[in-house]
């Protein structure tokens, strides 16, 4: 009962935060964009029995007990995943985050991968220490089941050139690494400067 109540509190906290802070869902993608898709396989009957009505609106086949069992055994529930887990994006390209699953997910930038804000899932997935960014509810964007959110544009202040880590703050094993690449002329200039300095 403790687990059931605890999970339910967390889920409804997430829905409340989503209502306050989420961007508008259903945003159309544009040509040349980069999509990150989030998947799960929640069985609505068993997930809603534990988490409350509406927690899972999908037609997945993994029961709640099977989900917890797989996570406990392997520290990963494979059907709960980001795709791709790693990607390269050129400066100027927009990103979009699509939730193809039946549960709410987040796509949160973190300095280092860690746990989320659901202590039970942190523990059994082997991520006991939450990523600090996952405890800052005011900045977390919740992506509803079936929703699409506008992500940062590569090369912007939110996604500059370099390597960036993103994770779901509910299911912290759902992770993506984005490598933002400089335009060819910038990369060529940087290489030339490095070679020039190496000769001095």
Label for each model-derived stretch:
Residues 1-7:
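N-terminal secretory signal peptides that target proteins for export/translocation
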Residues 12-22:
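Bacterial N-terminal signal peptides
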Residues 23-200:
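Extracytoplasmic copper-binding redox domains, predominantly the cupredoxin/blue-copper superfamily
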């Amino acid at each position: 009962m403790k687990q059931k109540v605890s999970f339910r509190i967390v889920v409804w906290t997430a829905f409340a935060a989503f209502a306050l802070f989420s961007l508008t869902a259903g945003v159309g993608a544009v040509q040349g964009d980069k999509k990150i898709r989030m998947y799960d396989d929640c069985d609505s009957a068993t997930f809603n029995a534990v988490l409350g009505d509406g927690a899972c609106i999908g037609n997945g086949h993994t029961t709640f007990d099977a989900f917890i069992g797989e996570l406990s055994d392997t520290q990963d529930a494979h059907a709960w995943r980001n795709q791709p887990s790693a990607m390269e994006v050129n400066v100027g390209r927009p990103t979009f985050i699509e939730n193809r699953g039946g549960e709410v997910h987040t796509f949160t930038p973190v300095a280092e991968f860690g746990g989320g804000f659901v202590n039970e899932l942190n523990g059994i997935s082997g991520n006991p220490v939450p990523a600090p960014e996952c405890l800052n509810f005011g900045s977390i964007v919740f992506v509803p089941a079936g929703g699409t959110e506008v992500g940062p544009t590569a090369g912007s202040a939110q996604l500059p050139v370099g390597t960036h880590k993103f994770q779901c703050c509910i299911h912290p094993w759902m992770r993506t690494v984005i490598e933002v690449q400089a335009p060819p002329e910038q990369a060529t200039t940087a290489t030339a400067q490095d070679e020039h300095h190496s000769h001095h």
